[in-house]
């Protein structure tokens, strides 16, 4: 089993959940603690053969080619996260990446600033893998990848999505996912329908 973790998704979840956690020296450590705690729980729960963690680039969203296609792409996130301490977030995220490296967990991210997101790498590796794949993310876009080999675990729902239950849970099948999102849009990414 290849377990692919949407590291950006997990990092934001950990940062928000443990935002006030600090080390004895006063430095914030909530993202680090939360990320490693959740990662450990997924490894214990799903017992993967291999773990891959992907991240969005730390660079500005303006360099993302998606902004050239749709000017308002993810615009509300910038407005909603004005109070977020990005310097602290990025510091902790760099620490998480170092820890993953020491644990021999493969980390993939756009270190060349090409505008690729974590999602791009998840899709690529899930589709290219020959064996079973479990994607860990709350991002509904991954439902389109679900088939006999690929499943998605949504941590917010604490539920594994597969071909049998996707339509009941999400309201659309994996084959209908792209059409559905094109029709209704995606508020989380500021994409109109």
Region locations from a protein language model:
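A short, charged helix-loop
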Residues: 157-186
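Surface-exposed beta-strand edges and their flanking turn/coil or helix-capping segments
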Residues: 18, 126, 165-167, 193
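Helix-hairpin-helix
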Residues: 140, 183-193
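Noncatalytic, basic helical substrate-engagement surface that gates or grips nucleic-acid strands
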Residues: 1-134, 142-160
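Short acidic/histidine-rich active-site segments
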Residues: 137
């Amino acid at each position: 089993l290849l377990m692919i973790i949407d590291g950006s998704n997990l990092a934001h979840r950990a940062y928000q959940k443990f935002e006030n956690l600090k080390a004895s020296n006063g430095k914030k450590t909530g993202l680090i603690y939360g990320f490693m705690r959740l990662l450990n729980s997924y490894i214990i729960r799903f017992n993967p053969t291999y773990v891959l963690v992907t991240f969005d680039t730390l660079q500005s969203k303006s360099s993302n080619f998606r902004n050239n296609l749709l000017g308002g792409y993810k615009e509300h996130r910038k407005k909603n996260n004005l109070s977020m301490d990005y310097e602290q977030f990025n510091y902790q995220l760099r620490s998480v990446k170092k820890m993953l490296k020491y644990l021999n967990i493969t980390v993939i991210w756009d270190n060349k600033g090409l505008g690729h997101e974590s999602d791009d790498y998840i899709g690529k590796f899930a589709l290219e893998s020959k064996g079973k794949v479990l994607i860990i993310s709350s991002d509904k876009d991954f439902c389109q990848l679900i088939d006999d080999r690929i499943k998605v675990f949504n941590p917010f729902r604490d539920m594994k999505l597969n071909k049998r239950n996707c339509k009941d849970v999400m309201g659309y099948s994996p084959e209908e996912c792209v059409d559905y999102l094109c029709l209704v849009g995606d508020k989380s990414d500021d994409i109109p329908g």
